[in-house]
Amino acid sequence: LKKDLHEEVIKGRLPGGSYSIRSAWPGIQLYYPPIKYLPAEERYETEPEARARLGKYARSSEAHTIIFDLEDGCRQKAGSRSFLSSVLPEVRQHIPGNVAIRINPMGTPENKLDLKLIAEIYPYIDDVMLAKAGEQEGLRDLSELANFLTGLSRNLRIQPIIEHPLALRKAADIFALPAVEHVVFGIHDFSRAMHVQITPGGWQQELYPFMCSLSLEARL
């Protein structure tokens, strides 16, 4: 997979240049639960167990970005925030790629706690992934997040997650934001919103028209 992605970057370069139309493809982005559920034992990890797992897997990962998820995939939100606050400053130097935090939608109670965490650990992260971007408040939620992040560091980037047709309609405006280099296509929530039944082996074809629309906006 990594080899194929690198080949795609090379194909995307303009003739005679060492750059692409936009910035380089972000590569492999791996979702990583800060606190993991252990189904065999019907419990969640303790902090020492989560710390040991992070040391074993995330440090040796070849992913270009490790995404610490605080949204839908995270059932222990408070514990995960506490864990990242105490552990990430210590282990960040050992993670070879970028670090991203996937946060809850702007304006929600969980989001306010997510932003408080980011204010503590921003020197150790590269990207903030915003769930449900552009759905309810249009670009206001992204502008609000961008202003918050700029107040911390101008190097922090936003990766909006496109999970609804309303957000797809605003894709051109989303890509025009200075803090946005890439977006993430949230296929599961998007397909549910469109009442499209996707399958594990055919989702690319089933969502092909929407992926083409998003790819076009990404290239303009």
Range-by-range predicted roles:
Residues 1-220:
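Expand to "…catalyze enediolate/carbanion chemistry for C-C bond making/breaking, isomerization
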